[in-house]
Amino acid sequence: MKKKVLTFPSEKIGFSSDNEEFDLVMARGDYLAKNKSQKYMIIDMLGTGTFGQVVRCVGSDGEEVAIKVVKNQPKYYNYEMNEVRILHKLLYNNLNDRFVTIKDVFMYKQHLCIVEELLGRNLYTFLKMTRFKGLDHPTLRTILHQILEGMVQLSLLGIIHCDLKPENILIADYDTFKIKIIDFGSAVTSPQGSHFYVQSRYYRAPEVILGIPYGSSCDIWSLGCIGYELYVGHPLFPGKDNMDQIGRIHGLFGSLPMFMLEHGKNSSTFFEKENGYRFMGPPSNFTLEDMKKMIRSKGNSKEDDNMLIKFLLRALQPSHLIRPDAKSLASHSYLKVRDTSAEADKACNDRSGVQQNIFPANKNMRHMSTTGVILPSKKQKPTDDRRKISVYGISYENNLNRDSE
């Protein structure tokens, strides 16, 4: 019986095992072999994207895993080897409670294969399951606290993630809402200069856009954007390009710190030095008051809403120099649970307004979505244009829309 080919395009080029996009052509039932005794049988395709493919496999020991099969090109190999090095560093330091666990790495037919634990849905998929109505305070509080725990651990090792976003935060346990952070391909281990953009655009810090040397505070900015999106249901700064992105940030706060505009090597691209730096793009009509109204419009606890607003505004300080670090932000009053049992019960059982029956009854079925990719059913419509999900949580089609430029 002919095996079902999972890779598209499925035509191999010449005598190679790759298609025209440098992806390994794989079929259900094929094996990815590290050696003669250690093989992984391919069960299903979990996602495809800019850097390659992710397949669900079962190992020789019967354990199900997710394997990233990287495109057969040096630039993608180098990118993913950066993630391998950082994941090994986290594993060596026993810091895998908040991060995806790397299990193995090997080469197969000139493709880098990264074996990782199988996880659940990412937070964007989970948000989609709420029909973008957003999460409630107990659930959001649980998630933000864990992300900050992970960020504190990263800071101890001098690691800057550089691509925090809902797609790169996966649910490891639906009963406790345990999450894990994935995708360290863009991560760095020291403060960086301003020679290239990092971060997906919706979550990109102003210092990165302006071309100012950045550090771990850029991750704090991303966290603030994530917090708003998870609660309200849509991104805070859905910029179409960097001009639109910095314009939305500028519009929300009314202005940006003068020293950032003076020292940003890209400032002249967005601002004209006339009467104190005039923004050259179209004005944004979404103000700080609009942001507060959106949060309060959900009709939840006013006290919680107000504390969340204060939390987000601390994380979203336009100046990276006064933005709090992860340890400081983790002690914010919004994250302090007043009634632990009540909060936990609500976070674990209410599912933030998500219908109970959308959660698979059996945990093995929960593992059907993994590694930051959305698993569309045959009846499901394609993901909307603003987020073309890829293997590594990075936009598909050359990072168009929210991730590019």
Curated annotation (Swiss-Prot):
Q: Which InterPro entries match?
A: Kinase-like_dom_sf, Prot_kinase_dom, Protein_kinase_ATP_BS, Ser/Thr_kinase_AS, Ser_Thr_dual-spec_kinase
Where does this protein hold ATP?
46-54, 68
Q: Where in the cell is it found?
A: Cytoplasm; Nucleus
Q: Name one GO molecular function term.
A: protein serine kinase activity
Q: Which SUPFAM superfamilies match?
A: Protein kinase-like (PK-like)
* Protein kinase domain segment(s): 40-335
- Fetch the CDD domains from UniProt: PKc_DYRK_like (cd14133)
First-listed, main subcellular location of the protein, grouped into a coarse class: cytoplasm
Decide whether keyword Cytoplasm is in the record.
yes
Could you list this entry's UniProt keywords, alphabetically sorted. ATP-binding, Cytoplasm, Kinase, Nucleotide-binding, Nucleus, Serine/threonine-protein kinase, Transferase
Q: Where are the transmembrane segments?
A: none
What PROSITE patterns does this protein map onto?
PROTEIN_KINASE_ATP, PROTEIN_KINASE_DOM, PROTEIN_KINASE_ST
Q: Kindly state which reaction or reactions the protein catalyses.
A: L-seryl-[protein] + ATP = O-phospho-L-seryl-[protein] + ADP + H(+); L-threonyl-[protein] + ATP = O-phospho-L-threonyl-[protein] + ADP + H(+); L-tyrosyl-[protein] + ATP = O-phospho-L-tyrosyl-[protein] + ADP + H(+)
Q: Where is the active site?
A: 163
- CC annotations in GO: cytoplasm; nucleus
| Gene3D superfamilies found in the cross-reference section | Phosphorylase Kinase, domain 1, Transferase(Phosphotransferase) domain 1
Entry EC no(s): 2.7.12.1
Q: What class of enzyme is it?
A: transferase
Name the PANTHER family on file: DUAL SPECIFICITY PROTEIN KINASE
User: Which family does the record claim for this protein?
Assistant: Belongs to the protein kinase superfamily. CMGC Ser/Thr protein kinase family. MNB/DYRK subfamily.
Per the entry, what this protein does is:
Negative regulator of the cell cycle acting downstream of the cAMP-dependent protein kinase. Part of a glucose-sensing system involved in growth control in response to glucose availability.
Descriptive protein name = Probable dual specificity protein kinase YAK1 homolog
Q: From which organism does this entry originate?
A: Encephalitozoon cuniculi (strain GB-M1) (Microsporidian parasite)
Whichever gene encodes this chain, its name is: YAK1
